[in-house]
From Swiss-Prot:
Belongs to the cyclic nucleotide phosphodiesterase class-III family. InterPro entries: Calcineurin-like_PHP_ApaH, CNP_phosphodiesterase-III, Metallo-depent_PP-like. It comes from Psychrobacter arcticus (strain DSM 17307 / VKM B-2377 / 273-4). This is Probable cyclic nucleotide phosphodiesterase Psyc_2036. The keyword Cell wall biogenesis/degradation does not apply.
Length: 279
């Protein structure tokens, strides 16, 4: 079994194949096979486990799994225990960071969002912050963009200083992973809950030419954007999806749960694509 958290990834050919999953939103630690209900709770549980099984059945070698936040829909240690057991059982190195739901519970989930009460929760200690993973040719920088008791995110001054130090001290191509998006996705409602100091973040990191890629969750949709030489990937949820380019909250019921592959090549180039759950 790989130790947690992973700090180095070594592969036979130097290339690192990363499986990104995000926004699991689990509300139960009961395995999907033991839950005979058709509730949203059971659906999220099933799709998480089914996506892991489907992704790892592909011909592509998986070298690292990165989980970019919102592992749970309510903060309970037993749910994290279950998630970490599923990931450990793959035998593949993995790393998890927090999203807003990992540090915030909601009351009145049946109410419109603005009528709900947000409750501050402490992050599970297994969720990583300012964590470096290195391979022969790449460096992956994992950030915790969550704010306890809030939906929106923030990259703190300490986080920014740490990223700048890593990018300055190591010339390897770099990937940053965090939960909240740092470029708008043209949906007013979710863009009001992005990383609130994204512009400041960009000002500090753009001078570093070795920064190639940023990956995030939070948006529950697939998007690819480019900003001054940096490619930014938003990745679908392993559960339910949000309708893209909608200013008001809306589910996208036409697309299935998904996950993202990233191939980090030895020459600093990146290939990435999204796959959807088959059944």
């Amino acid at each position: 079994m790989p130790s947690y958290p992973v700090s180095t990834v070594n592969t036979p050919d130097g290339q690192v194949n990363v499986l990104q999953i995000t926004d699991l939103h689990l509300s139960s630690h009961v395995p999907a096979s033991d839950d005979e209900t058709s509730s949203e709770v059971a659906v999220c549980q099933y799709s998480f486990e089914a996506i892991i099984k489907q992704a790892l059945s592909k011909e592509i070698r998986c070298d690292l799994i990165v989980v970019t936040g919102d592992l749970v829909n309510k903060v309970e240690p037993a749910i994290y225990d279950h998630i970490f057991t599923v990931l450990q059982d793959t035998g593949i190195p993995f790393a998890c960071i927090a999203g807003n739901h990992d540090v915030t519970d909601e009351t009145g989930e049946d109410l419109p969002f603005y009528q709900r009460t947000l409750i501050t929760r402490a992050a599970d200690p297994r969720l990583l912050s300012r964590h470096l993973i290195e391979s022969e040719h790449w460096q992956l920088l994992l950030l915790d963009s969550s704010i306890t008791g809030k939906v929106e995110g923030e990259i703190t001054a300490t986080d920014i200083d740490w990223v700048r130090e890593q990018l300055a001290s190591c010339t390897k191509p770099a990937l940053i992973a965090l939960h909240h998006h740092v470029l708008p996705v043209d949906s007013e409602w979710i863009d009001s809950h992005m990383a609130k100091n994204a512009e400041e973040f960009w000002q500090h990191i753009l001078p570093f030419e070795n920064l190639r890629v940023i990956i995030n969750g939070h948006t529950h949709q697939e998007q690819t954007r480019h900003h001054q030489g940096v490619t930014v990937y938003s990745t679908p949820s392993t559960c339910y999806q949000f309708k893209p380019f909608e200013d008001n909250f809306a589910y996208d019921k036409k697309v299935r749960p998904g996950y993202r592959w990233l191939q980090l090549a030895n020459n600093g180039k990146v290939a990435s694509w999204v796959e959807r759950l088959d059944t």
